[in-house]
């Protein structure tokens, strides 16, 4: 069965036989799926240059199984110019999607968040606000629900100047203990507003999303994070 023409992006690609590629796609209407791009590794294949991350594509495929066969791939726009830290950040976002969202689960809203994230990475000087916003949006799409506005212990509204300790599957409880699981009330209020304009809030948000995403990612390290760490000196 031939699919409708859809907008999408390449998340990851790897060799499949001598002449083909196995490609993870993220599409607007069908979500994440894996396709075989037959002949894409051949010298004269036009797909070799087209099937690249961060290039908006128009795609069509066929097949009823979980592994589809790509039948059409053409650029819908120019490749988003991600360079240096923005490029590694793009790899990180792609790996997140590959690891945490279920295959063939339509999510047009998440596709729009992803598109805005890539655009932000390509245009903004500081990539951190863009990354933190996408991580929180991804958590929302995964059904992750936590109340940033109330103390999980007392039900009282979060106080701007107090500290709260995160408890998995429960929320934030007022606490005088300060460790990796502790956040200021002002951080939680900013999280609720998706306001990552302040540097201290961004650092707290990064710490929180690592905690919140761990159950979805498991113990396997993110390759994109390792790659960034290995090359960080070259980026400075």
Swiss-Prot record:
Sorted alphabetically, the Gene Ontology BP terms of this entry are: DNA recombination; double-strand break repair
**Keywords attached to this entry:** DNA damage, DNA recombination, DNA repair
Which Pfam family, any one of them, does this sequence belong to? Answer: RecO_N
List cellular component terms (GO): bacterial nucleoid
What SUPFAM superfamilies does the database record attribute to this sequence?
ArfGap/RecO-like zinc finger (SSF57863), Nucleic acid-binding proteins (SSF50249)
Q: Which InterPro entries match?
A: ARFGAP/RecO (IPR037278), DNA_rep/recomb_RecO_N (IPR022572), NA-bd_OB-fold (IPR012340), RecO (IPR003717), RecO_C (IPR042242)
Leader peptide range in chain numbering? none
Q: Which domain of life is it from?
A: Bacteria
Q: Which family does it belong to?
A: Belongs to the RecO family.
Which HAMAP family would you find in this protein's record? RecO
Protein name per its UniProtKB record: DNA repair protein RecO
Q: Taxonomic classification, please?
A: Bacteria, Pseudomonadati, Pseudomonadota, Gammaproteobacteria, Pasteurellales
Gene name for this UniProt entry: recO
């Amino acid at each position: 069965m031939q699919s409708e023409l859809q907008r999408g992006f390449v998340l990851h690609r790897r060799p499949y036989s001598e002449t083909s590629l196995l490609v993870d796609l993220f599409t607007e209407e069908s979500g994440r799926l894996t396709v075989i791009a037959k002949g894409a590794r051949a010298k004269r294949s036009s797909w070799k240059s087209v099937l690249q991350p961060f290039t908006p594509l128009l795609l069509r495929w066929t097949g009823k199984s979980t592994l589809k066969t790509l039948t059409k791939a053409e650029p819908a726009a120019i490749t988003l110019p991600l360079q240096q830290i923005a490029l590694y950040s793009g790899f990180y976002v792609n790996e997140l999607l590959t690891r945490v969202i279920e295959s063939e689960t339509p999510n047009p809203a998440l596709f729009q968040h992803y598109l805005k994230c890539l655009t932000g990475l390509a245009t903004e000087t500081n990539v951190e606000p863009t990354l933190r916003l996408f991580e929180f949006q991804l958590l929302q799409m995964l059904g992750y629900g936590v109340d940033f506005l109330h103390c999980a212990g007392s039900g009282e509204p979060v106080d701007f100047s107090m500290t709260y300790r995160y408890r998995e599957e429960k929320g934030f409880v007022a606490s005088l203990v300060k460790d990796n699981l502790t956040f200021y009330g002002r951080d939680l209020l900013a999280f609720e507003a998706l306001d990552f304009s302040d540097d201290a809030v961004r650092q707290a948000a990064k710490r929180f999303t690592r905690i919140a995403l761990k159950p979805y990612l498991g113990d396997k390290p993110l390759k994109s994070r390792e790659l960034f760490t290995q090359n960080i000196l070259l980026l400075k």
